Amino acid sequence: MRNYNNFNRVWKAPRRPFEKERLDREMKLCGQYGLRCKREIWRVNMTLSKMRRTARLLLTLPENHPRRLLEGSAIMRRCHGYGFLDEDKDKLDYVLSLTVPDILERRLQTVVFKHGLAKSVHHSRVLIQQRHIAVAKQIVTIPSFIVRVSSEHHIAFADASPFGNGRPGRVKRVKRNAAKKGSGGGDDDE
């Protein structure tokens, strides 16, 4: 017998599907961050709403309440670790001020583009999906991967990638072989 997982939904569609201001805002974000569809924005929205809901709940508790101390420090550690908040912003009030672009800035696709490994955000998405990008020697093929601050400096081309130290791509190999045959074949005929 097989164990079935009941996965919860990770995104929530907007209540009003044709709200012009929201549609324009989402389209601008899709273009700016190279997103595939608006569902990626909705997924970030849901993550953000869960974090904000927890922060609001914790802010209603007294400051020395054990639950507020434990869960509040966990949320702040997570926000600092992923780079959503700066290290000097260490209060739960700052979690309420987080926005969707704050989280979209930490996606692997955006970070690869910001580091100059790709010509555009769309190019960085292609590089990631084609297994050219590695985070700390581990190839990552998910453009929506949230990059930690500690692993941000370890983003580079994969060792097996033609952009890195791997063997050259098909076109370069064909040209190299043609050049070898052209120079080597001419000597044999004479």
Curated annotation (Swiss-Prot):
Belongs to the universal ribosomal protein uS4 family. SMART domains: Ribosomal_S4, S4. InterPro entries: Ribosomal_uS4 (IPR022801), Ribosomal_uS4_CS (IPR018079), Ribosomal_uS4_euk/arc (IPR005710), Ribosomal_uS4_N (IPR001912), S4_RNA-bd (IPR002942), S4_RNA-bd_sf (IPR036986). GO terms for molecular function: RNA binding; rRNA binding; structural constituent of ribosome. This is Small ribosomal subunit protein uS4. Keywords: Ribonucleoprotein, Ribosomal protein, RNA-binding, rRNA-binding. Pfam families: Ribosomal_S4, S4.
